[in-house]
């Protein structure tokens, strides 16, 4: 039990709003529940959520100690009331989440609980699969990341052994990820390979294409194939053979087929015509190739997973379920 004394700066606030600010890790749903159950008292008595606090009031909070910790990335999951996840696949070792555009994988330098990892950790804690108090160091973790404005499949490991294996497999390129994108124009040829060198200006978070090797530029290879075209747009599937920052976006733009909605590498006037504010790019398909031993994850060898829905595929090409798309040749 913790006690809080209402001072001059706190007086006049509603009880629920005051406690919400004083205990930022406490989810709103739990806050309201604890008020109803009288686990939050004012001067020793239960109170309604809209009770106005007065100078000198003493609050008794019968709340678990972890909610009083300082907010940081590692405990941001505590703030999540009802996890918001779209799960593509789940077993005892891994979880594949369909991250929606606009959602951060991790917090961006400031404390934020509206992240994919916080929702996954809250989901597993609420299911009882992850018990933080029984762990010395491990917490469920993401094995790959996707930019905020890009959607798609993100892999989460539920235990340390799965995390180690998946990190190794990603490093050794034994997990294949394919992307859908909507681009301007009709790529010619309709199936091909883009090969050049990419130089990243970290200060500007901008990537530049170089046709020849030069200091700081890294080779980049993307295979693509056009799935269909409609009007001024084409739906393209891309396979990354290297993993460079903004690789698909910058290579497609350099080839003359910028991604719809791409504010950095696309064409502003074209994007305005469609009123798109985020790049039409989605990591929609994932395959565990695993040509070498995968330990406890060997059962995933050869398995492939896809998301069901990609908004721009439905909006511009009438494809409501992208699982129906023809499989790319292996």
Predicted regions and their residues:
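RNA pseudouridine synthases
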Residues: 1-330
């Amino acid at each position: 039990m913790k006690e809080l004394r209402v001072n001059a700066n706190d007086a006049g606030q509603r009880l629920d709003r005051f406690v919400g600010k004083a205990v930022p890790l406490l989810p709103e749903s739990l806050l309201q529940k604890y008020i109803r159950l009288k686990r939050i008292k004012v001067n020793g008595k239960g109170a309604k959520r809209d009770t106005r606090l007065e100078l000198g009031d003493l609050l008794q909070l019968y709340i678990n100690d972890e909610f009083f910790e300082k907010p940081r990335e590692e405990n941001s999951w505590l703030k999540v009331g009802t996890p918001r996840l779209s799960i593509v696949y789940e077993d005892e070792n891994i979880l594949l989440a369909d991250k929606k555009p606009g959602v951060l994988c991790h917090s961006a330098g400031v404390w934020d609980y509206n992240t994919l990892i916080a929702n996954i950790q809250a989901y597993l804690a609420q299911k009882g699969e992850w018990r933080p108090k029984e762990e010395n160091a491990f917490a469920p973790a993401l094995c790959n990341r996707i930019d905020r404005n890009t959607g798609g499949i993100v892999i989460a490991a539920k235990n340390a052994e799965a995390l180690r294996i998946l990190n190794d497999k990603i490093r050794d390129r034994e997990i294949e990820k394919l992307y859908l994108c909507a681009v301007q124009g009709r790529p010619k040829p309709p199936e091909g390979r883009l090969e050049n060198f990419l130089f990243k200006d970290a200060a500007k978070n901008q990537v530049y294409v170089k046709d020849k090797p030069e200091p700081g530029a890294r080779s980049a290879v993307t295979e693509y194939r056009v799935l269909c075209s409609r009007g001024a747009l084409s739906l393209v599937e891309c396979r990354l053979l290297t993993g460079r920052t903004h690789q698909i976006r910058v290579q497609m733009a350099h080839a003359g087929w910028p991604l719809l909605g791409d504010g950095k590498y696309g064409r502003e006037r074209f994007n305005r015509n469609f009123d798109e504010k985020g790049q039409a790019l989605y990591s929609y398909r994932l395959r565990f190739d695993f040509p070498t031993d995968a330990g406890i994850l060997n059962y995933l060898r050869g398995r492939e997973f896809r998301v069901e829905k990609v908004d721009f595929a439905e909006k511009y090409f009438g494809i409501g379920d992208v699982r129906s798309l023809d499989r790319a040749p292996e």
